[in-house]
Amino acid sequence: MNEKVDSTFSFKHINMEKDIFTIRENTLSYGRGYVYSLQYHLVWCTKYRKKVLTDGLDTECKEMLQKLAEEYRFQILAMEVMPDHIHLLVDCKPQFFISDMIKIMKGNLARQMFLVHPELKQKLWGGHLWNPSYCAVTVSDRSREQVLAYMEGQKEKEKRRN
């Protein structure tokens, strides 16, 4: 692998046979025998879009998600917990299957939230905190700022509604 760093623009050019990839140097991560840059914008909703993640539960969700990230060794780059859904911008290793990551986060978070707040089960008849679906979108260097602005805008939009 031939590497050339262009310090003027802070880009790294990686020549892999005939293909040339240009990636911002600060977004590259290194593993044993591989270089990667994998970020995802993840979104999932509460069951029935019930607005239950309020009154401090949003802060608890953030803390629990940070602990899960440390335990499972992925990075949360940005996070917004809305009353009825969660936005995450995550950076993970190529070995992670995104569907497994989401299952881990949703399952562990629901289990912990129901243990700490059993009253949630009454608000969400059926005993499920999350809708079974989710959205996972890859994020590039170019789209990262748009995703971050969108996530911040969601919080501002919610404040204006109330």
Report each predicted region and the residues it spans.
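Basic nucleic-acid-binding interfaces
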Residues: 2-162
